[in-house]
Amino acid sequence: MLVMAGLGLYDERDVTLKTLDFAKKVDKIYAEFYTAILTGTTMEKVEETLQKPITVLDREKVEYETNKLIEEAKDKDIMFLTAGDPMVATTHVDIAVEARKKGIEVVIINAPSIYSAIGITGLQLYKFGKTTSIVFPEPNYFPETPYDVIKDNLKLGYHTLCLLDIQADKERFMTANEGLSALLEIEEKRNENVISGETHAAVVARAGSTKPGLYYGKIKDLINYDFGTPLHCVIIPGKLHFMEEDALKYLFENI
């Protein structure tokens, strides 16, 4: 059996009772934290909560050694943990699919993720369009996909959730400031009037914690603001309902 379980967004207290129940029964627990990470806790605290040791896999081991993990699940009960929800990343979906192809029972235990946590903004979830990711620019690699996604969503009046790059192995987490700067840099190159310093944006920091940060304002005012510790995400609002306008006014710190 393969149990795919999410750990939630922030710390070990997000772990569900169902995950705790299965953790007691399984033979071995694996985890990965390169697609998302719990910034409010440590691996030791998670292990203490689950009362079992956890083998942490890096990106290469997850992407290239999944067959080994799946083979183990033929004869043993294996738990695979991720931050957030276990089925958000395509890599995790692939693991579940491959396991089912081999006739292995797969149990999926959902958990809070950024997709549920953005409800804290008061923006209507059905008005979000395609999600995009802003990554750290590298030599000869600076994808403009986020710009195109925002452009397409705005045409339809949709909000855009921008996830920010995580390089957990380097303990490098993109800030909202860096994400907004990247969007402006792409605009300067493309010059299609999609994003500017006058564009309004929302920043969510430390979603899932007891003290998340919610900030709203023009990009030119947000870009140098200190949003505190990560993780951050950015939302470019589309057409706003009057209730959403009230949410941005009263639930957010307006910069």
Swiss-Prot record:
- GO biological process entries: methylation; protein histidyl modification to diphthamide
Q: What class of enzyme is it?
A: transferase
According to its UniProt record, the EC number is: 2.1.1.98
| KW S-adenosyl-L-methionine (keyword) present | yes
Assigned keywords, A-Z: Methyltransferase, S-adenosyl-L-methionine, Transferase
What is this enzyme's catalytic activity, as reactions?
2-[(3S)-amino-3-carboxypropyl]-L-histidyl-[translation elongation factor 2] + 3 S-adenosyl-L-methionine = diphthine-[translation elongation factor 2] + 3 S-adenosyl-L-homocysteine + 3 H(+)
Locate the residues binding S-adenosyl-L-methionine: L9, D85, V88, S113, I114, L164, A207, H232
- Pfam families noted in UniProt: TP_methylase (PF00590)
Q: Which pathway is this protein assigned to? A: Protein modification; peptidyl-diphthamide biosynthesis
Q: Does the keyword Transferase apply?
A: yes
GO MF entry, a single one: diphthine synthase activity
The function of this protein is:
S-adenosyl-L-methionine-dependent methyltransferase that catalyzes the trimethylation of the amino group of the modified target histidine residue in translation elongation factor 2 (EF-2), to form an intermediate called diphthine. The three successive methylation reactions represent the second step of diphthamide biosynthesis.
Please give the PANTHER family that the UniProt record associates with this protein: DIPHTHINE METHYL ESTER SYNTHASE, DIPHTHINE SYNTHASE
Query: What family does the entry list?
Result: Belongs to the diphthine synthase family.
Subunit record text: Homodimer.
Protein name per the record = Diphthine synthase
